[in-house]
C-alpha cells in the first residue's frame, strides 16, 4: 500500500510516494529528527515483499529487504533485513573507526529501529489505528523526544 509508513512507522513523520508499484518505485521518508531518505525499489514480489536501496539523494547507504511470510490464513510474519554499505554510510570516518561505530552504535540502534517498525505494523494490523511518534520507544538516529 503506498505511503503505508504514515500509518505504521513510529519514527516516520511523512512518507511521500513519487512513483508506486513494481521495480523502479520511489518514495521519500522524512523522519521526526529531520533526516530525509529516498528509497528506490529494485526487486518487487507482490504480496511477498521487496528490496530497495535507501540513502540521501542519489547516494545509497543501505540495501533493505522487507519480506512477508504467510504462516496461516490469519497470521503473517514480517521480517526486515538491512545491509549497511559502510564505506558510503560512514565515509566521513577513518576506516578503522567505521567498524567500531558499526558494531557498537549503528547495529544496536538499527536492531531497536527494526524491532519497533515491525511492532508498528503489528499494532496497525491489530488495532487499525495509526502508530504515534515514538510509540514503542525513542531512537536517536531517527527521532526526537
Positions of PLM-derived features:
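Short, conserved beta-turn/loop elements at beta-strand boundaries and strand-helix junctions
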Residues: 45-50, 73
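Beta-strand/loop substructures that line and gate deep hydrophobic ligand-binding cavities in soluble
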Residues: 56-116, 123, 132-134
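Short beta-strand segments that buttress and anchor functional surface loops
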Residues: 25-32, 50-57
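Short, highly charged C-terminal tails/helix-capping segments
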Residues: 14, 115-145
Amino acid at each position: 500500500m503506498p505511503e503505508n509508513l504514515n500509518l505504521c512507522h513510529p519514527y516516520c513523520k511523512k512518507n511521500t510516494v513519487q512513483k508506486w508499484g513494481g521495480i523502479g518505485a520511489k518514495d521519500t521518508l522524512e523522519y521526526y529528527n529531520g533526516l530525509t531518505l529516498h528509497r528506490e525499489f529494485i526487486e518487487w514480489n507482490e504480496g511477498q515483499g521487496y528490496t530497495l536501496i535507501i540513502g540521501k539523494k542519489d547516494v545509497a547507504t543501505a540495501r533493505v529487504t522487507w519480506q512477508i511470510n504467510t504462516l496461516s490464513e490469519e497470521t503473517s510474519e514480517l521480517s526486515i533485513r538491512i545491509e549497511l554499505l559502510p564505506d558510503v554510510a560512514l565515509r566521513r570516518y577513518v576506516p578503522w573507526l567505521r567498524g567500531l561505530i558499526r558494531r557498537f552504535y549503528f547495529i544496536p540502534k538499527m536492531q531497536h529501529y527494526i524491532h519497533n517498525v515491525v511492532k508498528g505494523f503489528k499494532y496497525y494490523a491489530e488495532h487499525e489505528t495509526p502508530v504515534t511518534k515514538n510509540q514503542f520507544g525513542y531512537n536517536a538516529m531517527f527521532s526526537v523526544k
